[in-house]
Amino acid sequence: MAQFIDRRLNGKNKSAVNRQRFMRRYKEQIKESVADAVNRRSITNTETGEDVAIPHKDIKEPLFHQGKGGLRERVHPGNDQFITGDKIERPKGGQGGGGAGDGDASADGEGQDDFVFQISKDEYLDLLFEDLALPNLKKNQVNKITEWKKHRAGYQTAGMPSNISIVRSLQQSLARRTAMSAGKKRLLHELELELERIQNQEPAQKLEEMKLKQEIAELRKAIESVPFIDTFDLRFKNYERKPVPSSQAVMFCLMDVSGSMDQATKDIAKRFYVLLYLFLNRTYENVEVVFIRHHTQAKEVDEHEFFYSQETGGTIVSSALKLMDEIVKARYPVGEWNIYAAQASDGDNWADDSPRCKELLTSKLLPNCQYYAYIEITRRSHQTLWHEYEKLEESFDNFAMKNIRSVEDIFPVFRELFHKETA
């Protein structure tokens, strides 16, 4: 019996290479579709992938055809309506079922749907946060040299002889030999029983006995021909070099929860911070996050309370800045940590407090921060806090401020604030 062993490395995902090539080729169109999807789905929904639509015109293959100019004569079969010299009216515009046209429906004309396919959760998040990074991330003074440490990472089918795993290789060998010879051994046992029965019969059946002995000999030879060890059985210990963290970073999230922040404004702020939190967890393994909520008083809270607490009150923004400064001094030495902050507010603040905020940022926070981002969520004209912060933007390169007017602005503003710097 013939034995077929599938040793293809691609396994169940035999079109993975074609899929990767397609995604590389149409990366820009896919990224545009993912950016549009951010506004359609909940930002916290990262358990599933996303349906991506690419306009049919963008995936057309190039082709050679005759140009529009020149004179040509053609014979169209079945014509009983036109004669030489007649001008044929162009078909009226119509769209396919999934087209994006704005014209009216028509009984004439043809169109084609957009090409739609699904990307996985990991592909969605990779595309969402591609080209983003924490600005000005520097190595701290304590860990100036990147150290590497080897970690065991399972087994692989190729490697150095010194890394061979004898036990795992013999297990693979035993499994292969069992699979390839189990059927033959079962048949051999049956033939040996049959031979014993024939040998004990009277009169002796020499011809049948010789035939069975020949079959038994061939089976034993086939069983013995199964190699004890094969290159397919070899397993090598796999080691991966992982960098010891050389850059420690902390992100402070400061959110205004005062009474002037209505529910829609708070929802936009929370969505921005959820996006920031996902970005940090997806891109960096060793970034700590400190959550601060404030109204007239500021308080450090955990992740759950930051996003779901209903506490509210008046507005004194400087309380959050003071608390951040206290936490930095107590837990995050400037020489050892890269310090970042993202502040969200509707811009409504006690008038006398806005200059105080500017003073705190100028003298205490911005000199110690790698990057400080301020987003103001409002459709109204800006107030004193925005105008004070504008002076900071002129003086400090590590300070950025943006205005968010609606949910649709969240992702574009986020990308502007954290776009990866190019060398």
From Swiss-Prot:
Coiled coil located at which positions? none
Superkingdom, taxonomy of origin: Bacteria
Ranges for the region named Disordered are 81-111
A UniProt-annotated Pfam family: DUF444
Q: Which family does it belong to?
A: Belongs to the UPF0229 family.
Could you tell me which HAMAP family the record lists for this protein?
UPF0229 (MF_01232)
Q: Which NCBIfam families match?
A: PRK05325.1-2 (NF003707), PRK05325.1-3 (NF003708)
The name of this protein is: UPF0229 protein VV1_2091
Origin species: Vibrio vulnificus (strain CMCP6)
Lineage here is: Bacteria, Pseudomonadati, Pseudomonadota, Gammaproteobacteria, Vibrionales
